[in-house]
Design a protein with these regions (language model features):
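Outer-membrane beta-barrel "beta-signal"
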Residues: 52, 211-217, 238-252
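Intrinsically disordered, low-complexity segments enriched in Gly and acidic/Ser/Thr residues
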Residues: 176-179, 184-210
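Outer-membrane beta-barrel architecture
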Residues: 43, 58-62, 106-108, 150-154, ...
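C-terminal transmembrane helix-loop-helix hairpin of multi-pass membrane proteins
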Residues: 210-211, 221-229
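Cleavable N-terminal export/targeting peptides
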Residues: 1-39, 252
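Outer-membrane beta-barrel initiation region
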Residues: 2, 28-71, 130-132, 141-147
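Outer-membrane pore/translocation modules
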Residues: 72-175, 196, 226-230, 237-245, ...
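Short loop/turn motifs that connect adjacent beta-strands in outer-membrane beta-barrel proteins
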Residues: 29-39, 62-73, 112-118, 156-162, ...
């Protein structure tokens, strides 16, 4: 049943992304002309560490204006990945391999308050964890669907410095995430700075701290990040697991 549920999440995610891609596609000829800012934002990325990997992507649209103006936002997103962990079961160490997939649909609003830019979303999320072999002591298994809340903030601190905070929570496996970045533009729109984050669910919390580089241009951005993470499961390990992240975003 768990495998069937995971496949259903994957099929839903694939169908949604294909449908959105077909709807948002535009002729290449239109890109040759200088145009007003677009109303679509598409992103994709990969996140990996020694025990965890995740491929993710999503689309945000502004149905009543361009992507930089205040107003309603619609978003669909999802991802697929895997992870491993160990635990003592029946007096001996047991290794577990897991696959995970998620999909979400959200509606929200984008508002500017001077140098502060804020987005808030509400919606529904489906998250699946398929653990092999079945772990009787792991509460995060199977598929759960529940409401989701998202808050995103960007603050310009002068002409060169900025900070970013992203927060999310869903009742599906009590999954939550928080990420903080502080950037400084060292040349044009090339920024570098520190980042930190926490990811949690019913199984426990993972924390990370590292550095990132972000390059932005008219209509897009690309960022790379790396550092160390800690998997706070049974023995609350310190931050000693290297991680890397790459993210690409386009607005059109």
């Amino acid at each position: 049943m768990a495998g069937a549920s995971l496949k259903s999440v994957q099929r839903w995610l694939t169908a949604t992304m294909i449908a959105v891609g077909m709807q948002l596609s535009t002729p290449l000829v239109a890109q040759a002309e200088p145009a007003t800012p677009g109303w679509r934002e598409v992103w994709t990325g990969v996140d990996a560490s020694r025990h965890v990997w995740l491929l993710y992507g999503g689309v945000t649209v502004a149905p009543h204006g361009d992507i930089f103006s205040e107003g309603v936002r619609l978003r669909v997103a999802g991802g697929y990945g895997g992870y491993t962990y160990e635990g003592e079961r029946r007096g001996q160490m047991q290794a577990f391999n897991a696959r995970t997939a998620y999909a979400e649909a959200l509606v929200g609003y984008y508002k500017q308050f001077g140098p502060l830019f804020a987005k808030g979303f509400v919606g529904v999320a489906a998250i699946e964890h398929d653990v092999d072999p079945i772990d009787p002591e792991n509460p995060v298994q199977g598929q759960e669907v529940g409401p989701k809340l998202v808050a995103e903030f960007w603050l310009n601190m002068g002409s060169s410095a900025w900070s970013q905070v992203d927060l999310s929570w869903t009742s599906a496996h009590q999954t939550a995430a928080a990420r903080v970045r502080a950037g400084y533009r060292i040349w044009g729109d090339l920024s570098i700075g520190p980042e930190g984050g926490i990811n949690s669910n019913d199984l426990g919390e993972d924390a990370r701290a590292g550095l990132f580089a972000r390059y932005a241009w008219a209509g897009g951005e690309f960022s790379l990040a790396g550092g160390f993470a800690g998997r706070f499961l049974e023995d609350a390990q310190s931050l000693q697991d290297p991680y890397a992240n790459a993210n690409w975003l386009m607005q059109f």
